[in-house]
């Protein structure tokens, strides 16, 4: 199995959750996974190593995370599809707050239910797709 690079202690927590504690435990016959907020690809790597035929659909808006995700998933490019965007209840372009580790963040839209308002370190503008539309397309 390919190893994953952890860039912070937050990434180590995710490694333990996925590969140690098996928080995302799935059967070996899993065939499709949808991962909203894929971060640096650690959970995707877990799913990709459960079944050689699984297809994983990844959604991540943070550029630094996307580069790290691609590095962590080298060799699996034909088994995952990465869409560089956030997922929400409304489509469009929205502000997204993210802190230095890249693990925590969320959409900022004060008047929209289910959007995360935050005063984090960094705010970027990201493309947002509606969760229901994405799931309908995949399933």
Predicted regions and their residues:
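Phosphate/nucleotide-binding beta-alpha loop and adjacent structural elements of enzyme active sites
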Residues: 1-139
